[in-house]
Amino acid sequence: MSRYRGPRLRVVRRLGELPGLSRKTPRRAYPPGQHGQARKKRSEYAAQLEEKQKLRFNYGLSERQLLRYVRKARRAGGSTGQTLLQLLEMRLDNTIFRLGMAPTIPAARQLVNHGHVLVNGRVVSIASYQCRPGDVIQSRDRDASRKLIETHMQFPGLANIPTHLDFDKNTLTGKVNGVIEREWIALEINELLVVEYYSRKG
């Protein structure tokens, strides 16, 4: 299943607030469609599927990409759910978003794809690049890159920068100081249900 490119607000109405996908919040509190207002008890599988979809859409991943991250988190040992969230949060596109250099993860991915961002002084055009403590992320030193990022910064997606990141607005330079802690993950998610979803898939 490829990455979703359809109407974002429709997804937000179905799954709830997804800070990485869209700055918009739904006016209606129920899902879209003819039976959106009908409330029925969800099965355990439906709850697991919904949490998995929230994770996928928020971080802009294909099904195959998310499965790869789940397998990587399992191999790492410790809490699979927490490791999974940390892997996703430390992606370059998400790190740019959390630094406030882009209003959404799709906007951050565009910055990366078009070569507007440097990591440790080099252009990195891979959105899935896994940031590590000590990495320095900054705007490319050209007018087009700086202006685009400065425009993005006028409409930040989230108010606060997580404690594992630092950002200098004057130089448009951010630094990764560590790995994100669970309480700083902005998405409301039950990661255990995601792990359970993939466990039953084998």
Curated annotation (Swiss-Prot):
An annotated GO cellular component: small ribosomal subunit
Domain of life: Bacteria
UniProt domain S4 RNA-binding: residue ranges: 90-152
Gene3D superfamilies documented for this protein: Ribosomal Protein S4 Delta 41, Chain A, domain 1 (1.10.1050.10), RNA-binding S4 domain (3.10.290.10)
A biological process from GO: ribosomal small subunit biogenesis
Region (Disordered): 17-42
Alphabetized UniProt keyword annotations: Ribonucleoprotein, Ribosomal protein, RNA-binding, rRNA-binding
CDD domains (alphabetical): S4
Gene Ontology molecular-function annotations: rRNA binding; structural constituent of ribosome
Keyword rRNA-binding carried by entry: yes
S-S pairs: none
Record-linked InterPro entries: Ribosomal_uS4 (IPR022801), Ribosomal_uS4_bac-type (IPR005709), Ribosomal_uS4_CS (IPR018079), Ribosomal_uS4_N (IPR001912), S4_RNA-bd (IPR002942), S4_RNA-bd_sf (IPR036986)
A Pfam family reported for this protein in Swiss-Prot or TrEMBL: Ribosomal_S4
Family per similarity comment: Belongs to the universal ribosomal protein uS4 family.
Subunit and partners: Part of the 30S ribosomal subunit. Contacts protein S5. The interaction surface between S4 and S5 is involved in control of translational fidelity.
Role according to the record: One of the primary rRNA binding proteins, it binds directly to 16S rRNA where it nucleates assembly of the body of the 30S subunit.
Protein name per Swiss-Prot or TrEMBL: Small ribosomal subunit protein uS4
Organism from which the protein derives: Acaryochloris marina (strain MBIC 11017)
Phylogenetic lineage: Bacteria, Bacillati, Cyanobacteriota, Cyanophyceae, Acaryochloridales
